[in-house]
Amino acid sequence: MESLYRIPFTVLECPNLKLKKPSWLHMPSAMTVYAMVVVSYFLITGGIIYDVIVEPPSVGSMTDEHGHQRPVAFLAYRVNGQYIMEGLASSFLFTMGGLGFIILDRSNAPNIPKLNRFLLLFIGFVCVLLSFFMARVFMRMKLPGYLMG
């Protein structure tokens, strides 16, 4: 494989550059990187790319039996479409579930007092379970009749 990589460099000559890192560029802290990952996860799971391309409305509306327009947050019977608020709500739930797993992982640190460990376990389980069951409720709102055993 190395001989295959060597073929272009028989013709090309690499320049002799002395590059230095700019003095203003510093390594970001672990918490900064973590925050960027969580924010990007929130935006991606919320469908920000879909929202930019398709430009859906933030909420929809439906006509009730009396002829009045009522706002709806979920685009029912459409798996491949969403309103902006629907994407943000779902993204919040996914992010909350992910943070619940991270909190559960952090509760295993050896130097945490017993009360704090219990509180972290409780908060982590609540985040994960609430996220899971609310995602099921959202699926029932999105696709009525789905998940009805």
Swiss-Prot record:
Where is it predominantly found? Answer: membrane
Q: Which InterPro entries match?
A: OligosaccharylTrfase_OST3/OST6, OSTC
**So which stretches are on the Cytoplasmic side?**
1-32, 105-117
Q: Does the keyword Membrane apply?
A: yes
In which compartments does the protein localize?
Answer: Membrane
Membrane topology annotation: Multi-pass membrane protein
- Origin: domain of life: Eukaryota
Which keywords fit this entry according to its UniProt record?
Membrane, Transmembrane, Transmembrane helix
Pathway note: Protein modification; protein glycosylation
- Ranges per topology, Extracellular: 54-83, 139-149
Identify the GO cellular component terms for this protein: oligosaccharyltransferase complex
Which stretches are transmembrane? 33-53, 84-104, 118-138
Pfam families named among the record's database cross-references: OST3_OST6 (PF04756)
Q: Name one GO biological process term.
A: protein glycosylation
Family per UniProt?
Belongs to the OSTC family.
Q: What is the role of this chain?
A: Specific component of the STT3A-containing form of the oligosaccharyl transferase (OST) complex that catalyzes the initial transfer of a defined glycan (Glc(3)Man(9)GlcNAc(2) in eukaryotes) from the lipid carrier dolichol-pyrophosphate to an asparagine residue within an Asn-X-Ser/Thr consensus motif in nascent polypeptide chains, the first step in protein N-glycosylation. N-glycosylation occurs cotranslationally and the complex associates with the Sec61 complex at the channel-forming translocon complex that mediates protein translocation across the endoplasmic reticulum (ER).
The record's subunit annotation is:
Specific component of the STT3A-containing form of the oligosaccharyltransferase (OST) complex.
Task: State the protein's name.
Answer: Oligosaccharyltransferase complex subunit ostc-B
Its encoding gene is what?
Answer: ostc-b
